[in-house]
């Protein structure tokens, strides 16, 4: 069953608590390879142990918030505002879970669109936005670094499509 936590604010204590011990779309790349095979490496094992520890203790250790993360939090607001003005009305949601497989996977989309769409925003450093605009946009491809997260988000929400928004202040937005 899909559960929407619409009032939850991403990054809040409530949001961290809801994600505690759950596999989420943003972390799926740690257990699935870009070729969609199950990972079997130190990162995968470390992540599974981290989730296990969270389930046992009901505690999520604090994470370092660096300059890139701070920029991302600010850029996400700007990107969503620009997206809404350019493309479509958006509805914000904090967290979505789906447990139809006998276990729960979580996803924090940046916005939902109507009944069938969602938006995932990425704040990019200028050099990566330049790469996105020159390598991926002309051929209508998604940066491989984000494919697993977008696909998992669609799996969790059971929606039909996702606009991946790549944003860097001062440069064109890519969708």
Annotate each language-model stretch with its function.
Residues 1-74, 78, 137-140:
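Charged, glycine-rich intrinsically disordered N-terminal tails and low-complexity linkers that flank
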């Amino acid at each position: 069953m899909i559960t929407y936590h619409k009032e939850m604010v991403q990054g809040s204590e409530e949001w961290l608590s809801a994600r505690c011990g759950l596999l989420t779309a943003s972390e799926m790349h740690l257990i699935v390879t870009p070729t969609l095979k199950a990972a079997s490496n130190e990162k995968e094992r470390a992540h599974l142990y981290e989730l296990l520890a969270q389930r046992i203790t009901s505690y999520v250790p604090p994470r370092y918030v660096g300059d890139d993360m701070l920029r991302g939090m600010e850029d996400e607001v700007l990107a969503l505002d620009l997206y809404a003005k350019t493309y479509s009305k958006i509805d914000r949601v904090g967290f979505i879970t789906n447990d139809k497989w006998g276990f729960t996977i979580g996803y924090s989309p940046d916005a939902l669109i109507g009944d069938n769409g969602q938006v995932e925003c990425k704040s990019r450093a200028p050099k990566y936005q330049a790469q996105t605009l020159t390598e991926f946009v002309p051929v209508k491809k998604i940066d491989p670094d984000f494919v697993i997260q977008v696909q998992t988000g669609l799996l969790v929400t059971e929606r039909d499509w996702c606009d991946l928004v790549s944003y860097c202040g001062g440069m064109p937005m890519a969708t």
